[in-house]
Each structure stands twice: as C-alpha cells, then as structure tokens.
C-alpha cells in the first residue's frame, strides 16, 4: 500500500529546480509543462526506443538528439533545450540521479566488435546492433528493494534485462540445441516480482548480459557458436508482414529489428532477403546498398575493390571469431539496412493520395489513419510533421465524405483549426448522421412535398394560361368579327347615342339604367364563358364551348400547331418566322389598333400537297391562327358534333401531320415501306436474342474487357462540370437513370473528370447526354484506324448478288466491356438527390465520343464474324462499323444466310434494331446509297440534305456544304471544275467575298445533284474503261464497265491539276490528267485491268516524254503508273462528249501529239539556239559563285573572245544560277536593237530562256507545291530582255573547255572575268538595287523653286536637250524625288543615318541627290518604327534629392530581400534619415503595408518623433490604401518616387547595398548563416561610417563618437565615472549649433544650385520606355503628349504616374511636306496658291 513507481520523468519533475540550474549552465531555458509534453508524447514517436516515462540511457538519448537536430523540415528546434538538458543529466548525473543510472558505459556509434571471450573492458557497441557483453565488476546488490516508508521500486529504472541463471559448463562437442534445452530447463520461469527483486538481491552472472537468441552465440568456454534461423521464424515473418513493394517501411523495420536482435551472418542475411523479398526487390536493395559504400574520405565511392570488400555479392571468407571479421559483418548489416531504406523510397504519387476517400460508414479517425498511411507510402512527406499539417488537413477536408467535407469547409476561422480540431468536428458530424431509415423517410417526404407543390403550381399556371388565352382570344376574335361586319356594312358602325333621360338597358325614356325595373336584381352570379365561335358585337351568352379545334402543319420545315378559326380572314404566326416582307396591315383590336408585317412566302405542307403562303405576323396573338385563306387551300371540311369539332380533308379523311426530328426529316421524302420486322413477325420470335427489342442490351461475351493505354507522359485531367439548366438536366435524367439501371453507368471516384453536355434534339424538347472526351482523347495512345472506307466498300459487292439484307446494330459500342483499370478515364460528375447520387459516374462499356471506339468495335465485330464468313463462302457480308450488308444470289440463300447471321449475332451478344432492319429485299438503303439490281443511286434524303442548306455566309458553312456535296461527287461530272470558285474562300486568312461566280457554282452543284444518274456497282470480274478529258487545268473522267453493248458508268472522277502540270501544253496536261484519275480509279478497280481512252495519243508521249517539260522524278512516276501493261492499257483515240464524257458517234479531227508538242515555241518566236551568220556581236556570259574565307562571293561577266565588256561583283550569298541569269540579262540589255549571238555554259539559264521561262509564266511562277519559284525577279527580267535585240540566238556551250576554238577561248575568259570581279570589285549594292527596281527617269524630274535656287548656288548646269540639271557629271535628282527614294530605302532596311550614308557613299549612284544628307537625317528621325525600337542616346544630368532640415523629419523607406534566415525572416525593412544618414532596419517575414505602418508607429515614432516626409518607391506595400490612409491621418507627406528609377531613392538603395555587403562579410567571418543575429553589428558599422561631410550618423545625432572601452587599459577606473546629465545636454546643444545648422545650410545650398533641366516642355510629344518588354515587342510606347513637368520628371497624357525624364525620348513629328504654298496677294480677300516643296 502506498507504493509508487519512480520513473526518470517523475524524478526530474520532483527535482525541477536542479533541472533548471543544469539547463541554465547549458545556456538554455526549459519549462516544466513542455517537458511533460515532449517526453511522453513526442519523443516516443521517433522510433528509437524512447519509453514514455523517459530513460537515462545515453544511446537512446543520443538517437533522440539526432532526430531533434535533423536539418530541414524534419527537425525540431523547439525541443533542443530539453534534450540537451536531459543529455547533461545523463552525462553528469546529480546525486539524486546516480542511484538510478546503470554503471554500463554508453554505446558508441562505431562498429561493434564481438569478443571471443571475457575481456577486461567492455568493447564499444553500436546503437543499431547492440552486442551485450558482461561487465567486469558486478553491480552491487541493493540490500533493500521495497522501502519501509512506501518508497518507489528502483528496479524499473535499470536498462539491463533480468539476469539469467548460472550456466553450467558445456562440453566442447555438445550441440547447441541440447545446450539450450538444458539451459532452458534448468531455469524455471520466475514471477515478475521475483525477477524484479532478484536483480537487486543477487549479483548477475559473468555472462548474464549475453543474448542467447543470436545466430552467433558465445558459448560457455568463450567460443562463438552459429545458430541458423528456424523455418518457423522465417515463415511467420513472411506471412505476418506486407510485401516490400506494398509497404517498404514496415518490412524495413522488421529486418532492422532482426539484424539488431539476431546478429545474422552473411549467409543468414541472404536467406532472410530471399525469403522476405522478391528477386527484383532483392537486386534493387543490393544495388542501393553498394551505392552507399563510402571510401576512406567518407564520401561514396565507386571503386570496385572497395565496394566488393565492404559489401560482397558472393560469400566472403570472413572469420567471425576475430574482431576484424565481426567488424566486416557489422558494416555489411549497416550497408544492407541503408540499401533497404533507399530502395523503399517510392516516387511521389499524389494521385494515389487523392484517391483515398472516406467510406460511407467509415469513421473520421479511421479515415485519417488511412490518409496518413497513404502519405507515408506514396510521398516522401511525413504526415506527422508540423510543416505538413496544412496539406494533410486540406486532404482530410476535400476527401472526406461529401456531407462532412461541406460542413468542414464552412467552419469559422478554418485557417486556425488544427488537424486534431478538424477530426473532432468531423466526429461530431459523423455521430449526428441520420440512419438509412431516417434518410429514406426524409427523401420520401420531400419528394411527396415537391410533387404536391409542383402539381399545384402546374394547375395554377394552367388555369392562369387558359384564362389569359380566353381573354385575349375573345378580344382578338371580337375585333375580327367587328371588322368583318364593318366591311360588309360599308363602314364603321357606332352604337346609337342615348338621350339624357334614356335607359341604357331597356332603351326606354324616363329613367336610367341603375333604376331600370327590367334589370335583374340580387347578387351577381358567375359570368358564363364566351364561345369563341359565337361572338357578336354586343356579346351574348352561349353554351359550354367544345374542345378547341387544332391542327399541326409543317411551315418552312418546322411543325406549327394552329388554332382553327373560321372567322379569321388571314392566318397568323406568333413567333419569329424569319425574314419579314415589306408589306404590312393595320389590325384594329379591342384595346387599339396596330400595324403588323407580313412574312415572306413560306412553304406549307398540306394534305393536298406543298403550297406557298404568306402569314400575318402578330406577336401579341396568344396562339397561331389557321384562317380561311389556308383552310380554302386545304379544302378542309369542319363538322360540329356533340364530341366537338372535327376537321377532315376533301375526301373525308382526317387531317394528320407527322411531327419528327430534324435529323430524320429526310425520311419524309422517301417512299414509305412497311417494316420487315414487325412486333408479330416470325423473325422476332425465332431469334429473340438477336434483336434489341426482345433481347435487351447486348454484351459481347466472347470479347475480353478492353484496356485503354495512355501516353507515357499523360497525367489525369479534371474538368469541372459546366453549369446546366434545369430543363436540360431534367431532359437527360431519364437517359442517365436507364443507363444506371442497365449497369452501363456506375458510381465511381476518379482523378479524371470530363463534363456532360446536354444536346437538344432539333425540333423536339428532348435532350441526350454527350460527354466531352476531347481532353481524354489527347492523352490516350493513338491506334491505326482500320474502319473501311465507304468510298470503295461497295467495290467488293458483285453484281450477281441482288438479294440484300441490311442490319443496324443497336447501341453497338455498349456491347464491349471496359476493363476496371480503364473505367476511371471516362468519369463525369452527376448529382441527383432524388436518386441518392452525388459524385462521379463512369462507363463500364465502350463509350461514345471516344476516338478509338469505332476502330475497336469494328475489329471486335470482324473477329466475331470470321467463322460466319468461312462457313458461308457464297454469301457476301460487308461491314461498316455497326452497319451490316448481307448479299446473296437468290431469295432462298438470302433468307438462310440471314437466319444464320442473326443466330451468330445473338450468340456473340450483339443486338440488331428490328425497326431499321431490311430483310431479304431486292432494293435496300445502305450507307446513304440506294442499292438495286447491281446499281447504286443517291437517296432522296442525301439530295434533300444538300438542297436544304442555305447559302453559305462564313468559311465554316462553305466547308460544310463542300463536305456534304463532296460525298456525292462520284455522281457529279466535272465536280472539281464546278467547285473551283468555292475552294479559295475556305482557306484561313482569306476574305470571304461571295460573288456571282460563287453563286453560280453553288447553284450548278445543286442542279447536278437533282439530275444525278444511277451508277453501276463495280464488278471486279470485268475490265474497266476510263474515259479522260482535260480542260483549263482540270482533269475529268468517267469510269465505266461493259453491260452488253452499252457502257455503264461506275463513277465520275474529277480533280484539279497541280500548278506545274497546269502550265504544260495541252497534250502533256492530258498525260497528267490520266495519271491523276488513274490513281483515283484504283480505289474502285482494286487492281483490275483498266483501259484508258482519251482524245490524245498519250501512250507515245509517256514512252518518249520531252525532257524539256518534265522532271526526271515526274517522268519516272508517270511511266511506272501508266506503262504497267498488266493493269493499264491505252485504247484508241476517241472524241468525248463534254456533257457525258463518253465517246461521240463521229470521230474527231485527228492530230499528232508529238508533232504539236514539237511545234510549241517559247516566249520569242525568233529565238534560236543556232549561231546567226550576220550577227553584230558574239558574246560570252558566265556567272561564278564560290566560298572564300567562309564567305560566298559571286560575280558575273560578259566578254568577247579577247576582251571583257562588262564585269561586276554580286552581293555575298548570291547563287551561281542567279549570277548566270544576271550575266545573260545584262548581255541582252547591252545588245538592244542589234543582232546577237550569246554563248552560255549554264543549262539553267539556257533552259529558262528557251523553255522553262514560258512554262513558269504560264503557271504563275509557282512550284508544284504552290510556292513561289526561286530567282523570280531575275527570270522576269530575262523574259523581258529577250525582246530587246533585233535578232537573238542563245547557244549552250560546254564549260571549262581546254581547246583553242573561239568558243572555248570566250568561255574561259568569261569565267575568269567573273571570278576576278567577285574577288577584286566590291559588290555594288546601290546599283543592283536601282537596277532591280524601276529606275527614276530624268525626263520625269520636276524641280521646284527651292530646288532651282539650290542648284544655282551649287553651280549646276541645265541640259536643254534632255531637260534636266547636271552637277558633277550626273543628273540632279530633285528634293522630292530624293525624299521618296530615301524613304523607300529606309522602309526596306530601317538603317540609321550613318549606316545609310555609308551605304550611299560606297555605291555609284547615277544621279546627284539634292540635299541628300539633310533629307536622310530627316527620314531616319521621322521613322515611327525606328523610334519604337531603337535605344535612346539622350543623357539626363543628375538631380538633387531633397533632405530634411533636422534629424527625424525626412525618412526614406525600402524593402530589400535577403536569403531566408532562421524562423522565416526573408525581408529587411530599412529606414534612412536623409538628414543624418541614421539607419534603422527590421527583419520581417512578409512585405506588406501592415508591417510598414506597424514599424513606423511602434519603432520610429516613439524614438524619433513623427516624420514630416516619407519617400518610397512604388512598391505594393507603399502604395496600398492602408499605408496612404495612415500617412494622411498623421499628416505625413508621403512622396512616391519614379518607377524603375532607383536613383530617386538613392540614399536608402545605397544603404541596402551597404547592409547586405556587411552581412555577407560577417557571415563569412563568423561561420554562421543567421543574418538576423548579425544585423545589429551591420547597423553599428553603417551608423559609424563617415558620410560625405566627414561626420558619421552617430556623431550628427549624438554629438560625439560612440563610447569605446579598451579592456586592456591599466587604468580602467577612468571609465567608471560618466559625465553628468548637464554635460550631455550642453554637448547636444553645441552639436545642434555647430553641426545641424551648417549641415542643413549645406543641403539647402545644393538645392539652390542650378540643375540642368531636361529639354522637354509642356505640349511636346515623347516616347515612353516600356520597362518590361516581351518577345519581339518594341521597347518604347507612345507617342504621348507632355502635360506637366518638373526638373526631373514628366506627366504625360494617358499615364497616371510621373515618369522620370531619363525614361522618355523626344518624338520627331514629321512635318507635312506640302505640295502647295500659300502667298499673300494685294487683295486682302484673296490668297495665292503655288505648287512647291519646303
């Protein structure tokens, strides 16, 4: 009784005073409350063996210390004082601790050495692998365990295990099992009390501390014995722990404990790894362990000998009986443990963490544990770390159950809530949840209330609507009837006027209506309803009206429901019917008259046919009215019966109009046929599993679930659900419910999410759900599409099979299952409280909208039907995704094949639609075609789809039209030629200009569709014939097959030729047309023989093509395609009918293609390649281009045999082909009007002049790809120069000849002259520029009066014969021409004044430019583009800053960023007194206005008084409303300096640099990285550094240097007495008189000194620098007008802030160069205008 247990924690708390004294000696401070928190709660979580009651074991204390001192976010700096104090107590225990401390030495962190026998001293032991060794001296026994006064039990404080009994001597040859059995049997199991007391009473045995469970054991004779692992231990470890890949941390902890407690050998470690790890995991662990091997320098090494020595992969020869062998083993275990830890680090996968959500019935605490475990497994973050508490808290809120998460998000002050608070709140919410019965009852009650309320609202709304309609209809019909009567009576009929004494009720005189005796008395009864059809002017009572007669008609393609009104003269539409006509009618109603407009003519579908009618558009009418005008056209008959009005047609049949969807509108134009599979049909009863109507939703049971692979770099995408209207949500709700009931949609939780898009079906109010899978499609791997091409799918259908069956599979994609791993990809959000759904839904089947769905389904169905095709080889089965066509030769075969196909589909799990089935018919519709008797037609539906499209207004609408019409192009001859005007408008960036040509082409295509012929199906057993024609670059043809004596068209083909082929002569264009159409026809012929018939004999052209027109590549392509005699043959030349492209009965005029092609000439008819006998000149031209010193140089020359006529260097980079063209062109220009023979060795120049130039010109100077050809300007110049000589012969000669002929000598001289010109003569850029452009002819020069005055001053002469002035031997160019030329040159180059001047000086201009330099400077300065980009060279002089007149009145403030220090300080707020230079700096964690005002009010104001002026930059903390409001309230003038001008805050900016430099030096000198600790020393230096006037800020402020003490001075007594207070005051007064006033005067003198102002004035135009420019963005913006100026800054129009003068530059406003001048005249009312220039 009364006994208590003494623990280390309780012991320290009882002696807390001594603990605080020890902590003070360690320079730390501890508190009892926090020590109680850390010891039992924090330190046990470090997993180092710390007990909750504490321990004095130094090994455990050191391990806890290492955890506390860990760098980075996992450290615990707040626990440092407590663990340091605890360590000091353990190292030097006070008297009250010594009795409870074990005398054993603390474990050393070095590698352990197992002793081979008893030793004199205990060896050092590792904290990780403790090896228990006997102590030299036994512990003294305690005489008393239980104290008489109820003292604590002391035995619990020891760290040693209970002592074992004495071990008997063991025989040397005895085995270990028998020894251990003997040992165990000799020692009975003691009770806890006995073992506790025995340790205090009996001394321990010599080897009592040696473990008996290790594989390496110390025997009784001091020898180590080996005990391997038992199979039961390995089995238990394997089965009771998770795998390494599943939970590496837990398995690593197990192996660590095994290595610590069992001391396994190398073989045991391999056995342990092989049992607990897989082969791949083991290899990864061994690899990481070898990476952790360290060399002699302590760093990881990669030397093989050192790695193999420390961590061998093969069995080492270690001797465990020696200390060296045991040290090797200990190191191996340590490396192995490091490898386990490194290999167990899994990469960060936050998606896995996000996937952890709270279960429906899971408690919040259990969910939190799962969430923390996910953080440990999938991230490197520790969820217990305080720094990660925010992330864990947010995950806990977001991933909780929806009801808990929503309420947690609404908590007040959520940021201050800890994780423990959130769990507590979540538990409250979880415990207050309603039971499923209560929730179901609440849902039922709410549903009933909602339905009841909705029903009442609907009834009330319906009553109000009927009442309003009756009232408005009464007014309208009364107005109509009144108008009709007035029309019949010839005018307006007014009510007769009453006399003064006449009754308005009975019309008798003598009384009024209120006193009329005939008027009924009593309460007024309910007013009877008025019949709409019996209204009259006065109104009257009628019988109960019959049901409203209504009828639905189709107006303009839209169904409209009308109210039949025989009294209405005209039919009325209420809604906007589209365009309205200009006609209008005046409608007089009961409430007044109003004018309404008529609609344009609308097509109305009546029972008697389609008519055109115009309606009266009355938006105020409550219902559309069917008046007598349409009833007459309808020939309707109205019969009134007791049951109501009945409307019938002219033949007595009821009038009914079908209302249907827009996409099914085309079915109205088709011949109606009865469905082949009716509800009572035998096809349904015989094959119930094959039809969707009887078999339900299909499921392909033989197809494995599909796995959708993602791209390697794909990450989950989550797109929130778009807002959805209530109408749309209710519209798709039934579809969602149906898919949920069928299991196609299931609830899920997925990181993927894509929105649901409700799409309204046209013409109805029904919606269908469509999922936007665009982002998912981007992240899924692409597969090659194998869906058949409908263009040639029917080519495999032989004409002999004329019995068809068409099946359309219902919900085909939903028949294929999705693998569970791929289902989360297609998740979408859906909320329906009525169904109890609030979350995500995903597809279990293949969804629609997925890009690979058609291909996957097509392949799956094709594989499933493979056996059917093998078993029925006589049948033809065509498949296009989910559309099947079965063809047979007879009706019986078709029926049998259809039965087999339906049975196969049912067995496979697919379902066909009975409504759309076409079984065993000779005419069916398939893929938009009508198939019958081996032919195919365009269905009327396809034609109506194209015909119903309106005229395109945008490129997108035009592309839609061409796409729809292009599907039918096989039926339209010359389709490419018709659509040629339309295709240019579809290009991006082209202006959509719809003109007459486009309208004509649009109507021609529609007209061609209406007359589309029937095309025969391709018969692959017969040869094909292709008739080809070409016209104006368009290839046209028809593919036919023989049917008896006739040719039946199979397809009409047309295509536009490429630009190269379009420029050829007609015969060659025919070759290109045949090649293009033969390639397209191959898609239908499937490689069958093809006979080509054309009006040209092109076979000879293909066999021997002219090399001057065709390139080798194109020639090879044509020959390989057209000379394949096994497949392509040429028929006789035929003349084709341009309408049908079929041969004419009469033969056309024959011609020889080769002969015509040979007669085709180039540009110049007289041009030849043979020398002219009587030529005036024979010249040789050559161009040269070569590399010299890394630069390509070029030149051109024209020579005779012996002399050089012309040679010129060309710009660098000029190609040899261009140089040849320039040389040849120059020769032709110099031979103008003469006979010339010119030789060139360039095949390119020769072919361009003779052949290719004309070809280029014909095809618009474009390549085959449609791009512009190279050397375009040179080719055009050459073609133009060909007409200059009188007679011309361009002759090709071989280059680099060595003979002595005239041709060889001339060619060598031309080549040599061109090379020398390229090397010696600099390129004449200006001359080339002028030659390439249109030259300025002196005959067009016009000189102004100013030009003439200048010319006379220069001494220029006037050339009378040529009409221009000459100066320095050159024609003088007038000033206006000079301006235009230089302005054009500058716009091309945008060079500056100096560069353009140098360029013009270097060139040899043929003209003298008047006022060139002045004009050049003007052009360069007035260029707006250069002004926005070029840098400014203007320099602004330094200004003078305003300073305070005394300390504390004027401060400059700034934030500067410093690298993060301790406790999160990363900013420094600096205050500088501008008068004295005194600096105050405060470390801060944030850069906010709150901190600025706080430091100003708490630090600056109490010490220095209230500032008068504050100067800062435009930072957010200074311009915020908080800072400015505080300054305004305190009367502080807050001056904001110019942006991006640090000189404006120069004093504080310079101080920022000084403080940072000082802190850098101090950190390097002291070795610490805590700059906050060193900040006072930096401020001390800044405050005691002399300023510009030789005084330090401290001296200016206090009048003397700071007191310094020399502690080595022998006379320290003189520092003990300080001056009196009066002396201090006198000194400060002297400072104020001798220092402050002169200093203030000096500052004032600086302000009074004149400062050179900037040159800008109010009204000037300036460019403003853009300080943050993006890529390819000009550096200047503007120009702006200057509004205000200061000596250093400006305010411009359009920018609110002041701008420093250094950030602007003057904008040169180009003055208008007038072409007219104004002069005064003698008459004051007249002025004189003269042409001129300034």
UniProtKB/Swiss-Prot annotation:
SUPFAM superfamilies: Acid proteases (SSF50630), DNA/RNA polymerases (SSF56672), Retroviral matrix proteins (SSF47836), Retrovirus capsid protein, N-terminal core domain (SSF47943), Retrovirus zinc finger-like domains (SSF57756), Ribonuclease H-like (SSF53098). GO terms for cellular component: host cell late endosome membrane; host cell plasma membrane; host multivesicular body; membrane; viral nucleocapsid. The record marks 129-130, 214-215, 477-478, 533-534, 658-659, 1329-1330 as: Cleavage. It catalyses: DNA(n) + a 2'-deoxyribonucleoside 5'-triphosphate = DNA(n+1) + diphosphate; Endonucleolytic cleavage to 5'-phosphomonoester. Residues 344-392 are annotated as: Interaction with host PIAS4. It comes from the Viruses. This is Gag-Pol polyprotein. It comes from Radiation murine leukemia virus. The gene is pol.
